[in-house]
Amino acid sequence: MTVLAQLYYKYGTMNSGKTIEILKVAHNYEEQGKPVVIMTSSLDTRDGFGVVASRIGMRREAVTITDDMDIFAYIENMFKKPYCILIDESQFLSQKNVYDLARIVDELDVPVMAFGLKNDFQNHLFEGSRELLLLADKIEEIKTICQFCSKKATMVLRTENGRPVYKGNQIQIGGNETYIPVCRRHYFHPPIKA
């Protein structure tokens, strides 16, 4: 029986270890002599353009994805087909980008693992997340705990000057200084001043 490639969507809140997982998977493939392609959204420039970096200091160069990039053609035209494609910040992908990833799996038989946030600070799905939830063959939650208690964090609280923010642009690039992983209770009632 032939094992066919699949599209995986692994989501979690901020600080759940998504990027560490990407770097670990890449290392495991490459230790076996199997090349991978790491890609990330061009919107995330926290650690530099075309860089995937974890909060614990691990980092790798990555191919940047723009909304109009033809990811399918990029992979199809590579001299050596990768064994796996790893996507960071997949919430920022466009519908076209996600459809390209599905085509890579279905037509090129290359597995794709997309990692990202599911919902924004207002609890709305990102475009990339919505499309991945619709098209992924396997969906997995990467869990972390609420910053204020021991419950599972399922939401992201945006803060500004130490205060919760519930309105504003969907995309505002930031890290631990801006976004906090929280449970539902502490999203609606954070133990910080509003």
UniProtKB/Swiss-Prot annotation:
Active site, renumbered: E89
Pfam families recorded: TK
Classification via PROSITE patterns: TK_CELLULAR_TYPE
Gene Ontology molecular-function annotations: ATP binding; thymidine kinase activity; zinc ion binding
Keywords from the named record: ATP-binding, Cytoplasm, DNA synthesis, Kinase, Metal-binding, Nucleotide-binding, Transferase, Zinc
Chain residues that bind Zn(2+): C146, C149, C183, H186
Main EC class the enzyme belongs to: transferase
Listed EC numbers: 2.7.1.21
Main location: cytoplasm
Localisation: Cytoplasm
Record-level GO BP terms: DNA biosynthetic process; thymidine metabolic process
Tagged with keyword ATP-binding: yes
SUPFAM superfamilies named in the record: Glucocorticoid receptor-like (DNA-binding domain), P-loop containing nucleoside triphosphate hydrolases
A GO cellular component annotation in the UniProt record: cytosol
Domain of life (superkingdom): Bacteria
Catalytic activity reported: thymidine + ATP = dTMP + ADP + H(+)
Binding site for ATP: G12, T13, M14, N15, S16, G17, K18, T19, D88, E89, S90, Q91
Quaternary data: Homotetramer.
Record family assignment: Belongs to the thymidine kinase family.
PANTHER family: THYMIDINE KINASE (PTHR11441), THYMIDINE KINASE, CYTOSOLIC (PTHR11441:SF0)
Listed name of the protein: Thymidine kinase
Organism: Streptococcus mutans serotype c (strain ATCC 700610 / UA159)
